[in-house]
A protein has these predicted regions:
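Acidic, small/polar-enriched beta strand-loop surface segments
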Residues: 1-5, 159, 171-263, 275-308, ...
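Glycine-rich, small/acidic residue-mixed loop/short-helix segments
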Residues: 313-325
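Short, conserved beta-turn/loop elements at beta-strand boundaries and strand-helix junctions
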Residues: 84-88, 304-312
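Extracytoplasmic
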Residues: 2-4, 20-22, 33-37, 54-56, ...
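Assembly/oligomerization scaffold segments
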Residues: 1-101
Length: 325
């Protein structure tokens, strides 16, 4: 199988001009706001024109259609924000971040949100940044009695709220998306197809299973404005984790407790796979591993994907966790 790539810089296809100079391409896809990144390493012998910051790179990777069914799969748009040169041998490394993350999302704001649904809040924030909102059906009507945004960016606020309800939030292709974590949804909120990973596709595997989770229950607190008292909410039974945070209402406190308990459950198993390159795998995608052994066989949700093309071929590395119960 012959790896293939296509790179479009500022809407101009530059694939042929860099084909002979390419040393490697690495694309990292993370769930949530962690930030997707691109690294392109080029030979600089003889010297080429010094690259420019701010270039917009569209990247597609895959295999030759005559030898593999994948073809080229678009991996997104990236803005070059770092250029490195080293040697000998002389090489350039262009590093870029996904263009979806607008800088305005990082600017601090101070305001309060009262009597609003999570869907309406995300929609309002999206509109403020000239984006469209996509919120999972199970999250849209989640009621927020009160939340303060004090010298806090919209990015941090949304990440905080998503964590409280066991969700992930990510800007993709002009959308601001919030969907339940671990439910294998695409960036536009649609269900991702289940991808089967067979033993012959796996170059290396590593699974870690901790002895047992530390906690079987979570207690969170909320402030009752009528009684002026701090009330407790417990989810689960057994060894208890006690949250220090006090939430605005009982509903928010219970959702936060459920999300935290699920986090403890997910941390018991961690899977890493190195695969024959598969450009269709993405963060939050769901895979079914077959042909190995328990507890590796079965369903997993991808948290991180690294695609790499170099002189060794095309490989895909993934980190995954068990799906939501």
């Amino acid at each position: 199988m012959q790896p293939q790539f296509k790179i479009i810089a500022n809407q101009t296809d530059i694939t042929q001009s860099i084909q002979q100079r390419l040393i490697s391409i690495r694309i990292t896809d993370e769930s949530g706001f962690k930030g997707d990144t691109l690294d392109i390493k080029l030979d600089d012998e003889p010297p080429i024109e010094w690259p420019r910051h701010g270039a917009e790179l569209e990247v597609l990777i895959g295999f030759n259609k005559t030898t593999h069914n994948a073809g080229l799969v678009r991996q997104g748009l990236y803005i070059v924000d770092e250029i490195a040169h080293s040697g000998p041998p002389n090489t350039f490394t262009l590093r870029g971040k996904a263009s979806n993350l607008k800088q305005s999302l990082k600017q601090p704001k101070t305001r309060s949100w009262n009597e609003v649904t999570l869907g309406d809040l995300v929609n309002t924030v999206a509109q403020e940044h000239a984006m469209s909102a996509k919120v999972g059906e199970t999250l849209k009507d989640y009621a927020i009695a009160h939340v303060d945004q004090t010298d806090e960016s919209d990015l941090h606020l949304l990440t905080r709220l998503a964590r409280d309800v066991g969700a992930m939030v990510k800007p993709v292709a002009g959308y601001l998306v919030m969907v339940p974590r671990g439910e294998a949804k695409s960036a536009t909120g649609q269900s991702l197809p289940l991808m089967t990973i067979t033993a012959d596709q796996i170059k290396q595997h590593h699974v870690t299973q901790t002895e047992a989770r530390q906690y079987d229950a979570v207690i969170t607190y909320w402030h009752d404005t009528q009684t002026a008292k701090r009330e407790a909410v417990q989810v689960g039974e057994g060894r208890v984790f006690m949250s220090r945070h006090t939430y605005a209402d009982a509903t928010t406190a219970r959702s936060a407790a459920k999300a935290k308990l699920h986090q403890f459950k997910r941390s018991v198993l961690q899977l890493s796979l190195t695969l024959i390159g598969n450009p269709n795998l993405m963060a939050e995608g769901k895979i079914n591993v077959t042909g190995l052994r328990h507890p590796i066989n079965g369903s997993w949700v991808i948290e991180r994907v690294v695609h790499q093309i170099n002189d060794q071929g095309f490989t895909t590395r993934i980190d995954a966790v068990p799906p939501k119960d």
